[in-house]
Regions:
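Active-site rim helix/loop that mediates acceptor-substrate recognition in acyltransferases
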Residues: 1-10
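Conserved beta-hairpin
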Residues: 9-25
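Short hydrophobic/aromatic beta-strand or adjacent loop that forms the aromatic wall/cage
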Residues: 22, 119-125
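Conserved acyl-donor/pantetheine-binding loop and adjacent beta-alpha core of acyl/acetyltransferases
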Residues: 24-53, 59, 115
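Conserved acetyl-CoA-binding loop-helix of GNAT-fold acetyltransferases
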Residues: 51-54, 60-73, 96-100
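Conserved active-site alpha-helix within GNAT-family acetyltransferase domains
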Residues: 65, 77, 89-107
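Conserved GNAT acetyl-CoA-binding A-motif
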Residues: 68, 75-87
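Conserved catalytic-core motifs of GNAT/GCN5-like acyltransferases
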Residues: 86, 99-120
Length: 128
């Protein structure tokens, strides 16, 4: 999160001054998405959303869906044709939220850098 804040790509969902959720929005190609065991839907330019988190007390209240919708609007405004995201294979609640938001499962990726380099993730994409 420190790098996300430093790079000014962190967005917060809040209500009455209470933080309900947070996500990172990336407009540069994600090196972890260069190779996929599967196939991305689009070869066009994409934005990426990362580290989508909803506060425990806000879960089940549509916060994730609203954050995804905001990310989609930002991506469209910036001229992107799709949004990509990834999650852990065991993160079933996030996979359900992604499906509900219109993301399609595209295949498996491995993180290309950072402390979890090489870790398996499931890649999703939504065409805007």
């Amino acid at each position: 999160w420190k790098n996300d804040i430093k790079n000014q790509c962190t967005y917060v969902a809040e209500e009455d001054g209470i933080i309900l959720g947070i996500f990172a929005f990336q407009t540069t190609p994600d090196i972890s998405y260069y190779e996929i065991e599967g196939e991305w839907i689009s070869a066009g330019p994409y934005a990426a959303m990362h580290r989508v988190c909803v506060a425990e007390e806000a879960k089940g209240k549509g916060v994730a869906g609203k954050m995804f919708a905001h990310g989609f609007r930002m991506a469209e405004t910036l001229g992107f044709s799709s949004v990509r995201i990834d999650t852990h294979p065991g993160n079933i609640p996030m996979q359900r939220a992604l499906g509900k938001a219109g993301f399609e499962r595209c295949g498996e990726i491995h993180l290309a850098g950072g402390p979890e380099k090489g870790s398996l993730r499931i890649g999703f994409e939504k065409i805007l």
